[in-house]
Amino acid sequence: EAKSWITNRKELVENGGFTFEYSATFGEITDKDETFNEYASCVIFDYRYKYFYEDGFGKDYSILNLKDNEKYGDEYFTGAMLSLYEQKLYYRNYSRQIKPFNLENPLMIFVGSSVSGKKNESDVINVVRFLARFVNEKELFSRLIKDILTDKSSLVDTNDQPLFSSKFPYLRDMIRRDKEKINEIYRDLVKDLFHSGTSKTLQFVELKNAEGEIGLRFDSEYFGVINIGDTNSFLKLIENEEDAPYFNKTPIKSHFDKSLFNKIEKKNSNINFLIGSKKFIEGWNSYRVS
């Protein structure tokens, strides 16, 4: 694919034209092949991501590599839920103050490298399984939330310090001012992020008017959308999933709902989670991405 792109580029500029290209990751290329050598001889300005970020562009990032997904996965994902919940609270409570920064209602995205492989290898299956468990297993995740916010989490760094000790300053400040708040966070989070009311069964809705999209909901209101290429293979995995007591394994087909992905940028969008493959991140930009 890369080689065909190079051929097309050469055809476009062969009659005295030229290209001016920008790459944020060229300096990190590991394979020193012909393509690398060709580009290396043409660099006129080194503005790799390190400098791009230091000049105030891009996003802050935090990379947490888990040595044991089975042991620490629940705490890791719970920390992610708290992060999104905190950002949404701050966005609502300080919308006027942050308006000059062009920030929008926070959206969490999960980009999986595997979508419809074997069920134990599908990143997307693992994500939706966790989301369903989070809404249903109140006792477990209420405890994990309290452990994280009181620095009792078993997730530690190389110095055996709680991994989340410097995270969630806004939530921690709320708890310091009102200790009862910590008991309300799980309930409010589930209501805010998942629009969950009476139903606790995760429904998968195949949107026939939106190719590659599957809507996620517990009640009538969608909270998330899966955006992948092969929806049929993924829905087959759901139907055959054994470790999913909180799934409605019979997919619902909707011939009326429009694309949820296309509505993400709308001010009144209820979508808080975008889950899918790498296909939607190329050529797509959003101020909502958390």
Predicted regions and their residues:
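Conserved C-terminal RecA-like helicase domain
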Residues: 1, 93-274
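Signature of the SF2 helicase/ATPase Hel1-core->accessory helical subdomain module
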Residues: 1-99, 106-108, 262, 277-290
